[in-house]
Amino acid sequence: MRQHVNPLSRFFQLPLQLPSPGELFDHPEQPIHLDIGCARGRCILGLAELNPGWNHLGVEIRRPLVTAADRDALNSGSGNVRVLFCNANISLESWLAALPNDRLQRVSVQFPDPWFKRRHRKRRVLQPALLLAIAAALQPGRELFLQSDVLAVIEPMVALTELSGCFTRPESDARPWRADNPLPVPTEREQYVLEKNLPVYRVLYRRNASPLPDPEALKSRWQELDNPAETVFTDI
């Protein structure tokens, strides 16, 4: 059972200055995979072991999970994985903007907390400003991977991503949901869901060459749609 925290509470609204890649990794020049909402870090730790030529950063808003996961990261001695505590919508934008060109090569948002009610829209992890910060940091062809076991959670993420115009799905991927996970290590939640023979909804995007849209226009368009995914999927 996952424990929710309210990202809008005053404590989680305090911005944090996150360490630079040079402070986090032994080889900061390596490509970075950023996993937003990494929980206990099973996926990001496993990927770091399998891919020593990449750096792997997990961020998580639940501090006890971060403490345990980052301890494991440091104890691994690999020098290519860390887990940090932060509210992604408050502290990640400046970190992303400061990255060297094409350093960030993959972003994943996997099984975020299910704030699916419309009145909880602002509590969702993938907000317009964060999506645009991700899009600005990714060069064309780099990846954004989304997955959830709750349709009402992933549909708004897909809708927002589609509305931005900054990302394109591979033509070979099944619609509306990708059949498999492109990452070789499942998260804790994914493994639990699959063991229960429950569905997982996945979408892989690649950054295209389109310019960033106006942030306020994107936010307004996203908020005015009661069921944005329904509108967007008709065009896929």
Swiss-Prot record:
It catalyses: guanosine(46) in tRNA + S-adenosyl-L-methionine = N(7)-methylguanosine(46) in tRNA + S-adenosyl-L-homocysteine. Gene3D superfamilies: Vaccinia Virus protein VP39. CDD domains: AdoMet_MTases. InterPro entries: SAM-dependent_MTases_sf, tRNA_(Gua-N-7)_MeTrfase_Trmb, tRNA_methyltr_TrmB_bact. S-adenosyl-L-methionine binds at D35, E60, N87, D113. Substrate binds at K117, D149. It is an enzyme of class 2 (transferase). One of its GO terms (cellular component) is tRNA methyltransferase complex. Transmembrane segments: none annotated. The keyword Methyltransferase applies. Its EC number is 2.1.1.33. The active site is at D113. It holds the Pfam family Methyltransf_4. Keywords: Methyltransferase, S-adenosyl-L-methionine, Transferase, tRNA processing. Coiled coil: none annotated. The keyword Ribosomal protein does not apply. GO terms for molecular function: tRNA (guanine(46)-N7)-methyltransferase activity. Pathway: tRNA modification; N(7)-methylguanine-tRNA biosynthesis. Belongs to the class I-like SAM-binding methyltransferase superfamily. TrmB family. Catalyzes the formation of N(7)-methylguanine at position 46 (m7G46) in tRNA. This is tRNA (guanine-N(7)-)-methyltransferase. It comes from Parasynechococcus marenigrum (strain WH8102).
